[in-house]
Amino acid sequence: MKVTVIGAGAVGASCTEYIAMRNFASEVVLLDIKEGFAEGKAMDLMQMSAVEGFETRIIGVTNNYAKTENSNVVVITSGMPRRPGMSREELIGVNADIVSGVTENVLKYSPNAIIIMVTNPVDTMSYLIHKKFQLPKNRIIGMGGALDTARFRYRLAEALGCPVSDVDGMVIASHTDTGMLPLISKATRNGICVAEFLNKEKLNNIVEETKLGGATLVKLLGTSAWYAPGAGVAALVHSILSDQKKMIPCSALLEGEYGEQDISIGVPCIIGRNGIEKIMELSLNEDEKEKFHASVDAVRKVNGELKF
């Protein structure tokens, strides 16, 4: 199975590493516009294979989309990263042009590929390629909720003093600091609601810390995070190529689900060989419904800035 990763920056390189280390793809093509950059990253990773023993072949190329031909999955990470004080929405003007050009080239050589969108604002970028290229909704997956959910589960586990593996939780709605919706009502520790362990004030703090997770890292690092995002992408690719049918929150095109139409936003999805195989409609309480629809409205407003 062949995977292409567009953009050899921190997120692109880290997800390539995770994919290779797990040996579920036979080949990963890492593409970048900077001369020699992807080739260097690929060489470094392939030299690591002598230590780690993985068999995945990694090929680096400079803007040569012909080398990506017949990819099963294409990951798009290219675009301007967030800078300190910059919102994801402010990225839209620059990144919409980048994503459109990349997608056109990708589809020329891999017309049946499943596309995982990582470029921010991810809900809007996912919607853009849905509308511009008219692909089946199952083939465009926005990677936002997987990352937000990882941050939510980490914060819960930290507060509970338990392993992250003991904690289940989910974040839906938009992949934005203000619009994401961590679902406290459905978060559990070994099947028991976290509200049995933590008071309301602590839970509210966890929600706010989750929402600010990306911005906090941008402030500390001077750029966007890459380890957790790369791992989130790799988990999606793994679920597709191995047909795992995992339920992972992703930005998906809604056509009536949750009472919404014509919008890409974070919802729990079953991810398998065909991409998004099913959108799971959760039972939300009234407060969660109100916040979810408000998040949808905010994304629609950002989408209004797109030029097709």
Residue map of PLM features:
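C-terminal substrate-binding/catalytic lobe of Rossmann-fold NAD(P)-dependent dehydrogenases
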Residues: 132-139, 148-308
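Rossmann-like NAD(P)-binding element
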Residues: 51-113
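Extreme N-terminal starter segment of soluble prokaryotic enzymes
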Residues: 1-3
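Conserved N-terminal Rossmann-fold NAD(P) cofactor-binding segment
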Residues: 33-71, 300-308
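Rossmann-like NAD(P)(H) cofactor-binding subdomain of soluble oxidoreductases
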Residues: 87-153
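N-terminal Rossmann-fold NAD(P) dinucleotide-binding loop
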Residues: 12-13
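Glycine-rich Rossmann-fold phosphate-binding loop(s) that bind the pyrophosphate
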Residues: 8-9
